[in-house]
UniProtKB/Swiss-Prot annotation:
Enzyme class label: hydrolase
Alphabetically ordered keywords of this record: Aspartyl protease, Cell inner membrane, Cell membrane, Hydrolase, Membrane, Protease, Transmembrane, Transmembrane helix
Designated name of the protein: Lipoprotein signal peptidase
Organism: Pseudomonas fluorescens
Function summary: This protein specifically catalyzes the removal of signal peptides from prolipoproteins.
Amino acid sequence: MPNADSRFGRLGWLVLSLLVLVIDQVSKAHFEGSLEMFQQIVVIPDYFSWTLAYNTGAAFSFLADGGGWQRWLFAVIAVVVSAVLVVWLKRLGRDDTWLAIALALVLGGALGNLYDRIALGHVIDFILVHWQNRHYFPAFNFADSAITVGAIMLALDMFKSKKTGETVND
């Protein structure tokens, strides 16, 4: 009889995805309930603020003015990517911890933004990084941060694998 690890692969890492999803949704609810649209609360003067913004597009508001169809396009993409990530996680070996964490972070972030997109028609953003109140990076959220960290980890794993034939955690 196969053990749980061989049957389910690294699906235990879905707990990390769930944690990302919960932190993302709780933080979005907090800022949506405590800020007015585009209001800024300065955390670190000239560098970092909390805000409230809705994004109907993708990263950097890509296709935000699409008229509504983009909501469903990005939702379908998120569902497909999430399914691929779950299958990938399931197939990982016992020693693929670095890769499992990366995939779980991306999955949790994708699900957090997918929920917003389907339930609300937009993604809630609340983190604002800027330089001297003049040069602003687009607002983002916890899910976006998890996706970014996971993607960087995936890239590092690929570069390490390509260079040495081993994964980062080998």
